[in-house]
């Protein structure tokens, strides 16, 4: 009896994992589509032009990395901000994609680790 119950739970966990994986693929589709067009630009248009990007990584590398790291909404926003910097008045230089923050890392904690310390201050 235990074996059948264990198998049932394993099947449910596998189905949930499969559904979660499928949902992640669907959510990544818009970013992948934009990355596809950026790769087309890098393959066919960029070689015809002189290298002019004043940043490291280049704007197209930055766009691909920001889309992969942050998804389509924030990645596209970061890319537009980066392209807006690409002007003669900006010095350029090293401008990496910001790291992805954990949703709960920057927020307030509901239960402080040491309540006594906070009460004494």
UniProtKB/Swiss-Prot annotation:
Organism placement in taxonomy: Bacteria, Bacillati, Actinomycetota, Actinomycetes, Mycobacteriales
Protein name: Putative membrane protein insertion efficiency factor
Cell compartment(s), UniProt: Cell membrane
Family: Belongs to the UPF0161 family.
Purpose: Could be involved in insertion of integral membrane proteins into the membrane.
Alphabetical keyword list: Cell membrane, Membrane
Pfam families to which the protein is assigned, alphabetical: YidD
A Gene Ontology cellular-component term: plasma membrane
Annotated HAMAP family: UPF0161_YidD (MF_00386)
């Amino acid at each position: 009896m235990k074996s059948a119950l264990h198998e049932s739970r394993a099947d449910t966990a596998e189905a949930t994992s499969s559904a979660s994986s499928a949902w992640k693929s669907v959510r990544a589709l818009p970013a992948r589509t934009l990355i596809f067009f950026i790769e087309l630009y890098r393959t066919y248009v960029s070689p015809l032009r002189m290298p002019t990007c004043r940043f490291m990584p280049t704007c197209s590398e930055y766009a691909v990395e920001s889309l992969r790291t942050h998804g389509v909404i924030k990645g596209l926003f970061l890319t537009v901000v980066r392209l807006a910097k690409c002007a003669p008045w900006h010095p350029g230089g090293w401008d990496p994609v910001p790291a992805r923050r954990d949703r709960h890392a920057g927020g307030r904690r509901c239960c402080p680790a040491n309540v006594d310390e906070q009460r004494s201050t």
